């Protein structure tokens, strides 16, 4: 990916790309449930988190994320690792996620529409189920 392509993708995410996973499994008035399953070297593009959410690693692995503020973070996960995030009014986080390990890396992410300080971002797709 060129720097120009990365910048265009980042700008789109900042504007409101709410696709926080690869597959939207379910959506109700209260939650959105997503999955991510990345082969080594695969990447989920920049996306924007505005809702309170949590993710759980369903396979162990290692990732690299680039953030809109310029930070770069590498993280190792054990199966079952879970992390929670909370956002206040107008707060958000924009990042990408790349599998830099040598095995598949998978997550389930649950966005909490009910109880979040921000409205959910609109999506251009419907849940698979």
Sequence positions of predicted segments:
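Glycine- and acidic-residue-biased ligand/ion/polar-headgroup-sensing regions
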Residues: 49-71
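A short, N-terminal "cap"/entry segment at the start of jelly-roll beta-barrel domains
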Residues: 1-35, 43, 65-67, 71-94, ...
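A generic structured-segment signal
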Residues: 32-37, 44-49, 53-56
């Amino acid at each position: 990916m060129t720097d120009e392509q990365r910048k265009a993708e980042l700008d789109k995410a900042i504007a409101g790309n709410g696709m926080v996973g690869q597959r939207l499994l379910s959506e109700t008035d209260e939650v959105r449930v997503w999955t991510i399953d990345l082969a080594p070297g695969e990447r989920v593009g920049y996306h924007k988190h505005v809702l309170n959410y949590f993710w759980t690693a369903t396979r162990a692995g290692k990732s690299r994320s680039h953030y809109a503020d310029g930070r770069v973070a590498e993280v190792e996960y054990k199966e079952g690792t879970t992390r929670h995030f909370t956002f206040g009014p107008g707060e958000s986080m924009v990042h990408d996620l790349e599998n830099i390990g040598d095995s598949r890396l998978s997550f389930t992410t649950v966005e909490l529409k009910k109880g979040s300080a921000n409205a959910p971002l609109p999506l251009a797709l419907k849940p698979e189920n």
